UniProtKB/Swiss-Prot annotation:
PTM comment, free text: ISGylated in a CHMP5-dependent manner. Isgylation weakens its interaction with VPS4A.
Keywords attached to this entry: Coiled coil, Endosome, Lipoprotein, Membrane, Myristate, Phosphoprotein, Protein transport, Transport, Ubl conjugation
Short sequence motif Type-2 MIT-interacting motif: positions: 168-179
Family recorded in the similarity comment: Belongs to the SNF7 family.
Molecular-function annotations in GO: protein-containing complex binding
Name of this chain's protein: Charged multivesicular body protein 6
Task performed by this protein: Probable core component of the endosomal sorting required for transport complex III (ESCRT-III) which is involved in multivesicular bodies (MVBs) formation and sorting of endosomal cargo proteins into MVBs. MVBs contain intraluminal vesicles (ILVs) that are generated by invagination and scission from the limiting membrane of the endosome and mostly are delivered to lysosomes enabling degradation of membrane proteins, such as stimulated growth factor receptors, lysosomal enzymes and lipids. The MVB pathway appears to require the sequential function of ESCRT-O, -I,-II and -III complexes.
Subunit structure, interactors included: Probable core component of the endosomal sorting required for transport complex III (ESCRT-III). ESCRT-III components are thought to multimerize to form a flat lattice on the perimeter membrane of the endosome. Several assembly forms of ESCRT-III may exist that interact and act sequentially. Interacts with VPS4A; the interaction is direct. Interacts with VPS4B; the interaction is direct. Interacts with CHMP4A, CHMP4B and CHMP4C. Interacts with SNF8, VPS25 and VPS36.
Modification Phosphoserine, positions: 119
Lipid attachment locations (N-myristoyl glycine): 2
């Protein structure tokens, strides 16, 4: 029982996942650094203006040199962020390619197993047997069709002519509508029937 609950689950996090996470964390740290430096640059620019207004030109020049150096750092930081993002995208795309390759490998193995079960020789054998069965059935059909004697053929033709003659002898259906039934006719038939019963 203790083994059931004490066993560690196998982690689903791969080395690639860890690498991507680290790269993204580095990228985020660089962006935070970028934001801090940008804010410092704005403050230094405002301070340089104030120094110029106060007549402290050398101090303002020194501050602007410092600002220029930080701007270069910002450019390098931007390049590093771009490199990190490119690396993340490359790893993610490689993961997709690996999944595709795994899928292709599984599909290939499946096809190979199917081909082992159904070899070309087996397919040819089945097709030959099917062709033989079709040919055999055709021969049976020919024998059955050819088994009729002249007497049988004459009897078949005679029966066909008789059916055709019966259809020709049937009366034609009238094209005009039938007359309405007379309501008095059934009453007369009943009274006639009553007379016959009384007479007997």
């Amino acid at each position: 029982m203790g083994n059931l609950f004490g066993r560690k689950k196998q982690s689903r996090v791969t080395e690639q996942d860890r690498a991507i996470l680290q790269l993204k964390q580095q990228r985020d740290k660089l962006r935070q650094y970028q934001k801090r430096v940008t804010q410092q640059l704005e403050r230094e620019r405002a301070l340089a203006r104030q120094l110029l207004r106060d007549g402290r030109k050398e101090r303002a020049k020194l501050l602007l040199k410092k600002k220029r150096y930080r701007e270069q750092l910002l450019d390098r930081t931007e390049n590093q962020i771009s490199s990190l993002e490119a690396m993340v995208q490359s790893i993610e795309f490689t993961q997709i390619e690996m999944k595709v390759m795994e899928g292709l490998q599984v599909g290939n193995e499946c096809l190979n197993k199917m081909h082992q079960v159904m070899s070309i020789e087996e397919v040819e054998r089945i097709l030959d047997e099917t062709q033989e069965a079709v040919e055999y059935q055709r021969q049976i059909d020919e024998l059955l069709a050819g088994n009729f004697t002249q007497e049988d053929e004459d009897a078949i033709l005679e029966e066909l002519n008789a059916i055709t003659q019966e259809q020709m002898e049937l009366p034609e259906v009238p094209s005009e509508p039938l007359p309405d039934r007379n309501p008095e006719a059934p009453a007369k038939a009943r009274s006639r029937q009553a007379e016959l019963v009384a007479a007997s």
